[in-house]
């Protein structure tokens, strides 16, 4: 299925990188550190299908060292209130069974929607979706993804999340990484609908249309002022969605924390520099420090070096978190969760690398689609990860107060404000590949620390230098 020789070389390389990852120690003010957890992420069938639920419980009991907590999943292919009510009732039953087995319970759910070709499997309209959809800069409109500034959408989210949280009383409610500015297919970015344009104009005393706003953003109107305003507006659009959910959850389950699943989207400059506006909203509404789940991509290990890209990207996202965000549950993903996707040993090595990059916990999306029999998942994935757990626990304890050391592939904080060059297409400034050369260089054994606070040197390619003009 894969080259054993290549995978062995990759594991040896990771061993060297891990040995350098703890080179910089940063003692933190508080002696309190989050509890190490190994978490299993699920999909709705794991609580709705009683047979599958029982198979999962038996598998977790067979390997008790593997899993501390599960994330039960809200419905993501419907806006129907009745469908959500039925699912929430089944989820409450599953939550009780899991807690009785000594396993913690949290919940994850979507907000805006990943895109027309993701949740529903087809770009078909939902009759219950009565509010506005996302419209991008090219006037491309989604069918199933929601504009974040629609009041009816906020009402729906608050009611739906409160339903699940009230019945299940989860430890944490996690917002999926569809709460983002870019890539809600077919829309490239959000949101240039009439509602968003009207609110943006009112906020800044302007009269932009979609066309004139895009033109002004491209020519960098106000020497970066307009881009800053638009990026901030988009970030606040997401933050208000998070605020609505957090407020609704907190009202029915005051002890429930909030968490944000965020992709490694530092290349997408319209996302903003970090996720702090959203994380701040979660904390303001609950009074509790939010949790982070960084990471995306590397869905199979057919090309094992892909974990370097994901891990180093994750390191950059982790460095940009506020110190108060201490629970950092790295994504270990195997979509579509087939035996031919990732090997058990590959999962173990991948998990170790993400801990070295600064994660404090591990979240596994490796059985969601139930593509294999539960017994196969248990006797391969659960068994192998259980065997590695003592090593993970020792490493996390040793790694406290450290961060990756080495060379920082620097990306300036104002990269989004660079002037576009002749011949570049519209909105070329919203994305960058700056620093991507390190993924090949890392295979030589060079240690890197993206956004590191104690780097031994900086390295920049031409794209990174282009973004320095306004630093």
Regions found by a protein language model. Give the residues of each.
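Mature N-terminal, pre-catalytic/accessory segment of carbohydrate-active enzymes
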Residues: 21-110, 142-144, 151, 155, ...
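Aromatic-lined carbohydrate-recognition surfaces of secreted/lumenal glycan-active proteins
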Residues: 36-46, 106-110, 174-177, 229-273, ...
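The substrate-binding groove and active-site-proximal loops of carbohydrate-active enzymes
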Residues: 40-49, 75-86, 139-155, 223-239, ...
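Catalytic domains of carbohydrate-active enzymes, especially glycoside hydrolases
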Residues: 51-77, 167-170, 351-361, 440, ...
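Hydrophobic targeting/anchoring helices
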Residues: 63, 118, 171, 182-183, ...
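Active-site-adjacent "subsite" loops/lids of carbohydrate-active enzymes
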Residues: 107-168, 185, 205-231
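Active-site neighborhood of glycoside hydrolase catalytic domains
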Residues: 167, 191-258
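Helical hinge/lid and interdomain linker segments adjacent to catalytic or ligand-binding clefts
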Residues: 426-471
């Amino acid at each position: 299925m894969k080259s054993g020789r290549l995978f062995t070389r990759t594991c040896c390389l990771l061993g060297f990188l891990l040995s350098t990852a703890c080179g910089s120690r940063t003692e933190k003010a508080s002696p309190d550190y989050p509890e190490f957890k190994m978490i299993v992420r699920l999909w709705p069938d794991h609580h709705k299908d009683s047979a599958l639920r029982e198979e999962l419980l038996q598998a977790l009991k067979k390997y008790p060292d593997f899993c501390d907590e599960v994330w039960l999943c809200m419905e993501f292919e419907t806006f129907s209130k009745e469908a959500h009510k039925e699912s929430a009732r089944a989820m409450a039953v599953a939550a009780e069974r899991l807690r009785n087995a000594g396993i913690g319970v949290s919940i994850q759910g979507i907000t805006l929607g990943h895109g027309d070709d993701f949740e529903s499997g087809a770009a078909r309209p939902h009759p219950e979706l009565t509010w506005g959809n996302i419209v991008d800069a090219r006037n491309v409109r989604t069918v199933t993804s929601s504009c974040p500034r629609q009041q009816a959408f906020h009402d729906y989210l608050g009611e739906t999340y409160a339903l699940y949280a009230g019945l299940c009383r989860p430890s944490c409610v996690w917002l999926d990484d569809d709460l983002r500015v870019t890539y809600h297919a077919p829309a490239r970015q959000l949101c240039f609908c009439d509602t968003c344009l009207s609110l943006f104009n009112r906020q800044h005393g302007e009269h932009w249309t979609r066309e004139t706003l895009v033109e002004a953003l491209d020519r960098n109107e106000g020497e970066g002022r307009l881009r800053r305003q638009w990026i901030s507006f988009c970030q606040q659009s997401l933050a208000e969605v998070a605020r609505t959910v957090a407020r609704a959850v907190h009202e029915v389950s005051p002890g429930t924390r909030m968490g944000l699943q965020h992709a490694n989207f530092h290349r997408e400059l319209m996302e903003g520099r970090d996720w702090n506006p959203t994380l701040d909203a979660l904390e303001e509404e609950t009074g509790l420090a939010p949790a982070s789940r960084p990471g995306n991509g590397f869905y199979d290990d057919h090309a094992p070096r892909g974990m370097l890209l994901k891990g180093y990207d994750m390191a950059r996202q982790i460095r940009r978190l506020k110190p108060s965000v201490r629970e950092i549950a790295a994504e270990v993903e195997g979509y579509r969760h087939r035996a031919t996707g990732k090997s058990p040993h590959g999962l173990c090595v991948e998990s170790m690398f993400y801990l070295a990059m600064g994660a404090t916990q591990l979240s596994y999306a490796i059985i969601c689609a139930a593509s294999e029999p539960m017994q196969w998942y248990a006797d391969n994935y659960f068994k192998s990860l259980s065997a590695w757990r003592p090593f993970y626990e020792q490493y996390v304890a040793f790694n406290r107060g450290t961060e990756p050391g080495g060379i920082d592939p620097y990306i300036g904080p104002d990269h989004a404000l660079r002037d576009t060059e002749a011949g570049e297409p519209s909105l070329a400034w919203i994305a960058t590949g700056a620093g991507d050369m390190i993924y090949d260089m890392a295979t030589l054994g060079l240690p890197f620390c993206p956004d590191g606070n104690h780097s031994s040197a900086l390295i920049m390619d031409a794209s990174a230098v282009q973004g320095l003009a306004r630093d």
